Regions:
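Unchanged
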Residues: 3-323
Length: 323
């Protein structure tokens, strides 16, 4: 924002008020206003919103919307603290804040899990695990998810400031995390049965360079995986993606319409449907499936999650089997 005699760098909050790790959640519309009270969380560390009603943005466009709404809220709070009238503020181009952030996409309508549609899958209550430490009687999917994501971000190189994950999975790591490479994009995967991999995204790596992504596929057939297995290895995408600021900037850029026209009364008018996995992901790797010079140039590393376990809460059947 810009004012006479004042240059305000939006979203660059004074360092002594900065939070080390922000949690940004995309939730069902009816849960947004009640979330802070239900979970008893600090609004300076947590932010939640919902995708625009009636607008399908995809996981890529949804990430852009979530980050923009978060920045807008930070700006609003800053202006209020400084007692600067918002109507005098002229929007300017701004970069992402410096602290690390965890983004959870949990705004689905739960059509396949209707019992938890009102609260969203993210607050699904999970029974205490037998013989496990750190369990709580009131635990839910969110409280079980978060510790692993926080550990990953604590180990991540400084420029990997954004972690994006799904709100309808529970992922466990039974072994210590390995060192995280300093790449533009780092994704975690699991060695799984080929049949299971056909229902998810799959990272394909050359057998001579297993840590480097050759290309990504979405829900490949068994025949495809069988043919590739002679020369390649594959890991199932478990939905934990770390992005550098450069990668986030490009993701946000690709989520916008070509003309970039923004209607002040419709803040999402410049956005389009863009999927993090099927669009952005297929543009990554040494031999990407989608040609895009800027995205193709991003460095990518693939890590198997040590002792990893993957539980999906997408349907009522999966709720029972995963629990």
């Amino acid at each position: 924002c810009q004012l006479p005699n004042i240059i305000l760098l939006c979203c660059q909050i004074v360092s002594n008020t900065a939070i080390d790790m922000q949690k940004l959640l995309s939730l069902p519309p009816n849960l947004v206003s009640a979330f802070y009270e239900l979970e008893n969380v600090d609004r300076t560390e947590w932010f939640c919103t919902s995708d625009p009603v009636g607008m399908k943005l995809g996981s890529g466009g949804g990430t852009t919307w979530l980050l923009r709404e978060w920045q807008k809220e930070r700006d609003r709070k800053y202006l209020a603290e400084e007692r600067i009238p918002t109507e005098k503020c002229i929007p300017t181009e701004k970069s992402l804040p410096a602290e690390k952030r965890i983004l959870l996409h949990a705004g689905g309508q739960s059509r396949r899990l209707p019992g938890y549609a009102p609260s969203g899958k993210i607050l699904t209550p999970i029974p205490v695990f037998r013989w496990a430490r750190g369990q709580k009687l009131g635990q839910n999917l969110l409280s079980l998810q978060l510790p692993l994501y926080e550990k990953i971000m604590e180990r991540a190189p400084e420029r990997l400031r954004t972690l994006i994950a799904s709100g309808d999975v529970y992922i466990r790591a039974e072994k210590p995390l390995q060192e995280i490479p300093d790449a533009d994009v780092v994704c975690y995967g699991l060695w799984v049965d080929p049949l299971l991999a056909t229902h998810h995204g799959v990272f394909i790596s050359d057998r001579n360079q297993p840590e480097s992504l050759d290309f990504m596929l979405q829900k490949p057939s068994l025949e495809e995986l069988e043919n590739l297995s002679k020369t390649h290895l594959f890991l199932m995408d478990i939905g934990i993606w770390l992005l550098s600021d450069r990668a986030v900037d490009l993701l946000m850029k690709r989520s916008q319409k070509a003309d970039g026209a923004l209607d002040v009364d419709t803040p999402y008018s410049d956005l389009k449907y863009y999927d993090l996995y099927a669009d952005f992901g297929l543009s990554l790797g040494n031999h990407p499936r989608i040609e895009d010079e800027e995205l193709n140039s991003l460095s990518v590393a693939i890590l198997p999650l040590p002792g990893g376990e993957f539980y999906h809460y997408g349907t009522s059947r999966e709720l029972l089997s995963s629990t």
